[in-house]
Design a protein with these regions (language model features):
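Double-stranded beta-helix
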Residues: 102-121
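Short hydrophobic beta-strand segments that form the core of ligand-binding sensory/regulatory domains
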Residues: 50-52, 75, 85, 94-98, ...
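Amphipathic, well-ordered alpha-helical segments in soluble domains
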Residues: 50-53, 132-139, 156, 163
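Generic protein-terminus/edge-of-domain signal
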Residues: 1-71, 82, 88, 123
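Ligand-binding loop in jelly-roll beta-barrel domains
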Residues: 67, 80-103
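Short, Lys/Arg-enriched, Trp-marked, Pro/Gly-tolerant hinge/linker segments that flank
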Residues: 117-130, 143-202
Length: 203
């Protein structure tokens, strides 16, 4: 029986996540971004949690002294409303995962010359939220107050990556009607653009 193929970008992220979860020994410390620093020059802040994974090279967060150099396998978790000032001073391959309420956003950066570059690959995938992802994200947000508890934090992040792999490796549910798909698309658009001014052209 022939396996159903995923779209190319989705398959790329499925393979990337498989490489991470099947080789957990390559994953290192989990760092946490801080809230309340979104006014800093160059800062990036989101309404939803985000996880950055350094696949190769060096990356960093200029807002926190101990996070200015993150190396291969290290991760930066940003709770909702937390901010970071990304550092792309050296070559780096970076996976960034955004956890929105009804969809998962994945971005792959390959900065060969030590400077910020547009995302090479980017997908947004709807997912049925049954509570497991929200529970893990909430636990990580609480654990940001005690970042030294890596023996608890790292297995939790590995579980979160397993969940991401499951979502990315799955095709959309066959029973999704046109109306449901349209509703999900509208929700995604509102979540991304609710703070922008609304006009006929922007819609």
């Amino acid at each position: 029986m022939r396996a159903t193929l995923l779209p190319a970008d989705q398959q790329f992220f499925a393979d990337l996540l498989s490489g991470l979860v099947l080789n957990p020994q390559q994953l290192g410390r989990v760092w946490f971004a801080q809230r309340g620093a979104s006014d800093a020059v160059g800062s990036v802040s989101r309404d939803w949690p985000r996880l950055d994974v350094v696949l190769r090279g060096e990356y960093g967060n200029r807002l926190v002294a101990g996070q200015q150099i993150l190396r291969h396998g290290e991760m930066l978790f940003l709770p909702a409303q937390a901010a970071s000032v990304p550092v792309f001073e050296r070559p780096v391959m970076l996976l960034s995962i955004l956890f929105a309420p009804s969809w998962l956003g994945l971005v792959f950066h390959d900065s060969r010359h030590g400077q910020s570059v547009p995302a090479q690959r980017h997908v947004e995938l709807p997912h049925p939220e049954r509570g497991e992802c929200a529970a893990m994200l909430m636990a990580l947000t609480h654990l940001s107050a005690s970042p030294q508890d890596q023996a608890i934090i790292q297995p939790l992040v590995l579980s979160l990556l397993h969940w991401c792999r499951k979502v990315v490796s799955s095709l959309p549910e066959p029973g999704l009607s046109r109306g449901d798909f349209l509703y999900q698309s509208i929700c995604n658009w509102v979540q991304e653009n609710y703070a922008e001014s609304l006009s006929r052209e922007s819609v």
